[in-house]
Design a protein with these regions (language model features):
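Soluble non-cytosolic domains of exported or imported proteins
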Residues: 62-65, 80, 135, 139-140, ...
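Short, glycine-/small- and polar/acidic-enriched structural segments
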Residues: 21-163, 179-185, 200-202, 208
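Sec/Tat signal peptide C-region and signal peptidase I cleavage site
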Residues: 15-20
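Conserved C-terminal helix/tail region of periplasmic/extracytoplasmic solute-binding proteins
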Residues: 298-346
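Pocket-lining segment of extracytoplasmic ligand-binding domains
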Residues: 168-266
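Bacterial N-terminal signal peptides that target proteins for export
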Residues: 1-7
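Secondary-structure end/capping motifs
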Residues: 223-315
Length: 346
């Protein structure tokens, strides 16, 4: 009896070890406590990485610029970031944009203190001209703010831009050390709820489309296309599930945001869902399709590339076709099992 038990135990261990060996490590980078990063948390809680044979190793960064810089040391393989750092990442490190995390045009904005908001309501241009705006340079918030300046007939040279991390900006607004800031959600909701700040103009109101980017190191994607496709399938499935289970998703969001030190009301969490369109596999493929001209995603990233050239962040305007690719989304679509996995809301 003892012998049979030992044999059974040995078989179980062998099977477990064999299964563990089938899991391929993949290094995933993102910025914590952000709406578009929620799928990574949901997928981990649901055990979906294992289902496609991946073992994720996560690394987080406070903003996109340090995140893309870390790719030079191969600190990560795939991930999500803002569209502005995604373009910068291509130019500096050969990073590919392989999909869109969400439309965050309403989630990047020019924010003002209560006092400044009152001035802005009377005369936006006068309230902004000559003022200092604290923001994180080369970010989606930077893009949104400069789009808003154009809306009111102003140029970058009409204001003073002061570079700060988002945590510093929250502190500055809360202590009345700044009146104007470029921010992204959920930091926007934090200062609205805790510092009485107001959104003066979102990227959407400024006429800008601000997509988030799913990214991969160029060399990693070329050598491991199936791993990249599996990564995308897991990410897309998480969005499908979140869309079908918003109440449970908000509960998970509360935990995910708290881990990154963010505490906002449930109403603000719901606003994340209501104002940030996300895209399933079919929509991703349609947005990235190049028939006889540039795709919709090409147009979005071309606008961002022009902005970055105008601000001096880039020496020339890169060709979008050199870094935006639907190759890996197509791999998901072409694999029946991956396609079914990616489109399931269960």
């Amino acid at each position: 009896m003892l012998k049979k038990t030992l044999i059974g135990f040995a078989v179980a261990v062998t099977v477990g070890a064999s299964f563990a060996q089938t899991l391929t490590p993949i290094k995933i980078s993102y910025q914590p406590s952000l709406y578009w990063a929620m799928p990574f948390h949901v997928a981990t809680e649901k055990g979906w990485w294992k289902e496609v044979g991946l073992a994720p190793e996560f690394s987080t960064f406070p903003a996109g610029v340090p995140q893309i810089a870390a790719s030079a040391a191969k600190s990560w393989d795939v991930g999500g970031t803002g569209s502005v750092p995604a373009v910068l990442g291509h130019v500096r490190f050969g990073i590919k944009t392989i999909g869109v995390t969400n439309d965050e045009s309403a989630g990047n904005a020019l924010v003002g203190s209560g006092k400044k908001a009152a001035e802005f309501a009377k005369d936006p241009a006068a309230a902004l001209r000559g003022q200092t705006i604290t923001l994180t340079q080369n970010s989606t918030a930077d893009f949104a703010v400069q789009s808003c300046l154009k809306r009111y007939g102003l140029k970058k040279s009409d204001v003073v831009m002061k570079n700060m991390g988002q945590a510093e900006i929250i502190s500055a607004l809360s202590s009345n050390n700044t009146d104007l800031a470029g921010m992204w959600a959920p930091n926007i909701y934090t200062v609205e709820e805790k510092a009485g700040a107001k959104v003066l103009c979102s990227g959407k109101e400024g006429g800008a489309v601000v997509p988030g980017a799913l990214i991969a190191r160029g060399d990693y994607a070329k050598e491991n296309p199936q791993n990249v496709a599996k990564f995308l399938a897991v990410y897309l499935r998480a969005w499908k599930w979140m869309g079908a289970n918003q109440k449970e998703s908000i509960a998970m969001m509360k935990d995910f945001y708290a881990k990154g030190g963010v505490s906002i009301s449930e109403a603000s969490m719901k606003k994340e869902f209501d104002t940030r369109p996300t895209f399933d596999l079919g929509q991703q493929l349609k947005m990235m399709e190049r028939k006889n001209s540039n795709s919709q995603v090409d147009a979005w990233f071309a606008q961002i590339s022009v902005f970055m050239r105008e601000t001096g962040a880039l020496p020339t305007i890169p060709q979008v076709q050199d870094f935006v690719t639907d190759e890996y989304m197509k791999l998901v679509q072409a694999d029946p099992k991956l396609r079914e996995f990616a489109t399931s809301s269960k």
